[in-house]
């Protein structure tokens, strides 16, 4: 094929040969016929790489600022409390990587080994990978278009040497963008257990979550359930609960009932969570008796139970 024009949607895109940028391109007829598309060899390479990962979980949110990365980090912390469980946390929020800060790993660098990129370890059984480790400063902006982001995600999935892992948690950017399509495409052959979707109680967040749920249905991504974050504030003195973000349309609970999706739990606001993230420490250690800690632990157990039942079902399907 000849040189592609600026703005080319790509030969494997649904717009191949039909987009505005395709007009006048010498490859237009070839792309429109579908002959220019070829299977990405990375899909098979990633499938092979992921054979050592038992469970793969995506953490999604419709809107930014609802606590998705905080949840991803503490899901990893919670699962890794069992010293026999190997946990990997992959941050694919390319333009806004906050996992290094939350996990206390700012300033760390990625090292190359004979078997690929080595994760940065919080503990012996908790490894982390993020584009933040590739930046010279945490204040550096990542100004990349879709294809370069997709290439980075492909490299993370194919080249990071996690070893044998029980849980791979993928922290995604908000919304339904190139990053989401890429990770679902590349992991499809490797079998994704499902997605956990974060929201806050107010309708302005829920309307974007409904779009996220629609995205999951369209790409056939199983939904483990929804977590309502910042769900009220429980006073540490009087124990009375106040609604900081009133659920004007019933919150995540009503939405989950309407859409027949599991509500995994509600996490109340706790100032210790923000402080722990800024210090790069586990909130569970900072505030073990907090109602938010209890809510997190209940949600994590439900996710663990889902994965175990999912694995048992898969083993039943492939047994002779």
Curated annotation (Swiss-Prot):
Keyword hit for Acetylation: yes
Binding site residues for ATP: 62-69
Keywords linked to the UniProt accession: 4Fe-4S, Acetylation, ATP-binding, Cell projection, Cilium, Cilium biogenesis/degradation, Cytoplasm, Cytoskeleton, Iron, Iron-sulfur, Metal-binding, Nucleotide-binding, Nucleus, Phosphoprotein
Localisation: Cytoplasm; Nucleus; Cell projection; Cytoplasm, Cytoskeleton, Cilium axoneme
GO biological process, one term: centrosome localization
Modified residues (N-acetylmethionine): 1
Database matches in SUPFAM superfamilies: P-loop containing nucleoside triphosphate hydrolases
Requisite cofactors: [4Fe-4S] cluster
Main location: cytoplasm
Entries under Pfam families matching the protein: ParA
Binding annotation for [4Fe-4S] cluster 1: 8, 22, 25, 31
Positions of modified residues (Phosphoserine): 319
Positions annotated to bind [4Fe-4S] cluster 2: 235, 238
Induction of expression: High and constant expression in cycling cells. Down-regulated upon cell cycle exit and quiescence.
GO molecular function ontology, one term from the record: 4 iron, 4 sulfur cluster binding
CC terms in the record's Gene Ontology section: centriole; centrosome; cilium; cytosol; Golgi apparatus; nucleus
Record-linked InterPro entries: AAA+_ATPase, Mrp-like_CS, Mrp/NBP35_ATP-bd, NUBP1/Nbp35, P-loop_NTPase, YlxH/NBP35
Tissue-by-tissue expression: Expressed in trachea epithelial cells, and kidney inner medullary collecting duct cells.
Biological function: Component of the cytosolic iron-sulfur (Fe/S) protein assembly (CIA) machinery. Required for maturation of extramitochondrial Fe-S proteins. The NUBP1-NUBP2 heterotetramer forms a Fe-S scaffold complex, mediating the de novo assembly of an Fe-S cluster and its transfer to target apoproteins. Implicated in the regulation of centrosome duplication. Negatively regulates cilium formation and structure.
Family, as annotated: Belongs to the Mrp/NBP35 ATP-binding proteins family. NUBP1/NBP35 subfamily.
PANTHER family, per database record: CYTOSOLIC FE-S CLUSTER ASSEMBLY FACTOR NUBP1 (PTHR23264:SF35), NUCLEOTIDE-BINDING PROTEIN NBP35 YEAST -RELATED (PTHR23264)
Remarks, miscellaneous: NIH3T3 cells expressing reduced levels of Nubp1 show an increase in number of centrosomes per cell and an increase in the fraction of multinucleated cells.
Quaternary data: Heterotetramer of 2 NUBP1 and 2 NUBP2 chains. Interacts with KIFC1. Interacts with NUBP2. Interacts with the BBS/CCT complex subunit CCT1.
Record protein name field: Cytosolic Fe-S cluster assembly factor NUBP1
Organism from which the protein derives: Mus musculus (Mouse)
């Amino acid at each position: 094929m000849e040189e592609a024009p600026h703005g080319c949607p790509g030969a494997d895109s649904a717009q191949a040969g039909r987009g505005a940028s395709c007009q006048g391109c010498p490859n237009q007829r070839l792309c429109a016929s579908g002959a220019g598309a070829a299977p990405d060899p990375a899909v098979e390479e990633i499938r092979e790489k992921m054979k050592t990962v038992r469970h793969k979980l995506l953490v999604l949110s419709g809107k930014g600022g609802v606590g998705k990365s905080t949840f991803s980090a503490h899901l990893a912390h919670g699962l890794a409390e069992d010293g026999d469980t190997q946990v990997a946390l992959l941050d694919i929020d390319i333009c806004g990587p906050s996992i290094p800060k939350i996990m206390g790993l700012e300033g760390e660098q990625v090292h190359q080994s004979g078997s690929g990129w080595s994760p940065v370890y919080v503990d012996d059984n908790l490894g982390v990978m993020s584009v933040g480790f590739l930046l010279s400063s945490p204040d550096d902006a990542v100004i990349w278009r879709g294809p370069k982001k997709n290439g980075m995600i492909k490299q993370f999935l194919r080249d990071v040497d996690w070893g044998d892992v029980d849980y791979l948690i993928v922290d995604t950017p908000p919304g339904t963008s190139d990053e989401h399509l890429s990770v679902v495409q590349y992991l499809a052959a490797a079998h994704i257990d499902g997605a956990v979707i974060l929201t806050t109680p107010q309708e302005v967040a829920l309307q974007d979550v409904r779009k996220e749920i629609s995205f999951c249905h369209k790409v056939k991504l199983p939904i483990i359930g929804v977590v309502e974050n910042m769900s009220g504030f429980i006073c540490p003195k009087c124990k009375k609960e106040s609604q900081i973000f009133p659920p004007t349309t019933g919150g995540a609970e009503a939405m989950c009932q309407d859409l027949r999706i599991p509500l995994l739990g509600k996490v109340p606001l706790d100032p210790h969570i923000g402080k722990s993230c800024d210090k790069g420490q586990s909130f569970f250690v900072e505030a073990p008796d907090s109602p938010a800690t209890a809510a997190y632990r209940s949600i994590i157990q439900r996710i663990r139970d889902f994965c175990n039942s999912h694995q048992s079902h898969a083993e039943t399907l492939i047994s002779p």
